[in-house]
């Protein structure tokens, strides 16, 4: 098979290569999937750069956790009826050296989730890490009717889904954007927006006042350290913060007394160690939303396999609003 890989961590252009590797046959409980689209996540880029949250001990790694494709072979114990099934994939490179940046990947069958009719391969490859993280965040902050939720990063991969999911759970949601272009994208998905930066507190206060509320019950945050001051300023007593990243500072000093005064509860989340029972619940709910068309999905920006270094750089520099993906050579259509 043709695949992209790296042998040592480093800059994308320095370490990513494309070449041929043996195809792994599916063993018991495994499926072999022909990859149509390979999704690129910030965590994939961090792993390749040696900055991942988990160790990557393999001598040669095919990157990327997420993707979508068609099951071509199954191992012993797997229903033969799954051959030909369209699936979306998640955590393919978790605890394994081979991810989805290849023409084929072989994974435990539970990581290949049926992709509902009418849902594109591009969308399927966009789920995985972002959608499961978003569901986890909305569950942790108990998004439901009567609660107001502020989502930081309305058009980020996680934030775009999190804002929608919180609304689908019945919460009232406000989400931050960096510019008018981002606001238009978010608003087209039914998300109310507020500008990031110095104007955010006043604009958010006005939004709360219109709802006769004094503060937010919950925050879903892509930068815990950077956004903590504004979150504290806008927090209702007993508010919850679900943080899935803190790139500006992984070792922040916490204003413990201020957090105590407002009885703020903190939840730090990593989808890769999310309890299996919650992951199953997330997949079931996500499948329901996919089938009934409740979710809007980010625009996909595709790169050819031989341009994978450019794809990784696009994620690192936030070149696009939407999802970066890699298309393996000879990828199946549909």
Spans of model-derived segments:
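Mid-domain Rossmann-like dinucleotide-binding core that forms the NAD(H)/NADP(H) cofactor-binding site
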Residues: 125-198
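N-terminal Rossmann-like NAD(P) cofactor-binding module of classical short-chain dehydrogenase/reductase
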Residues: 88, 217-220
């Amino acid at each position: 098979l043709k695949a992209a890989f790296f042998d040592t961590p480093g800059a994308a252009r320095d370490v990513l290569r494309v070449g041929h590797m043996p195809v792994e046959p599916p063993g018991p409980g495994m499926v072999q999937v022909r990859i149509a689209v390979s999704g690129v996540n910030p965590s994939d880029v961090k792993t390749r750069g040696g900055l991942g949250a988990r160790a990557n001990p393999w001598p040669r790694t095919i990157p990327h956790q997420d993707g979508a494709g068609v099951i071509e072979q199954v191992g012993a114990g797997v229903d033969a009826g799954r051959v030909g099934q369209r699936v979306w994939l998640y955590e393919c490179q978790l605890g394994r050296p081979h991810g989805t940046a290849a023409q084929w990947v072989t994974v435990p069958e539970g990581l290949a989730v049926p992709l509902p009719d009418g849902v594109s391969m591009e969308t399927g490859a966009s789920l995985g890490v972002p959608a499961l993280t978003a569901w986890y965040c909305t569950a942790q902050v108990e998004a439901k009717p009567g609660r107001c939720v502020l989502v930081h990063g309305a058009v980020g991969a996680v934030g775009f889904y999190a804002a929608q999911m919180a609304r689908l759970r019945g919460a009232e949601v406000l989400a931050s954007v960096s510019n008018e272009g981002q606001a238009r994208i978010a608003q087209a998905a039914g998300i109310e927006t507020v500008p990031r930066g110095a104007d955010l507190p006043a604009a958010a206060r006005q939004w709360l006042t219109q709802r006769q509320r004094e503060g937010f019950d919950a925050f879903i945050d892509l930068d815990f350290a950077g956004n903590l001051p504004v979150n504290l300023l806008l927090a209702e007593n007993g508010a919850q913060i679900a943080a899935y990243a803190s790139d500006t500072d992984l070792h922040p000093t916490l204003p413990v007394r201020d957090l105590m005064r407002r009885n703020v509860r903190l939840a730090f989340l990593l989808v890769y160690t999310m309890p299996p029972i919650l992951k199953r619940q997330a997949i079931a709910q996500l499948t329901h939303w996919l089938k009934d068309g409740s979710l809007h999905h980010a625009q996909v920006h595709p790169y050819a396999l031989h341009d994978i270094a450019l794809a990784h750089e696009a994620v690192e520099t936030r070149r696009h609003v939407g999802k970066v993906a890699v298309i393996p050579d000879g990828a199946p259509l549909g």
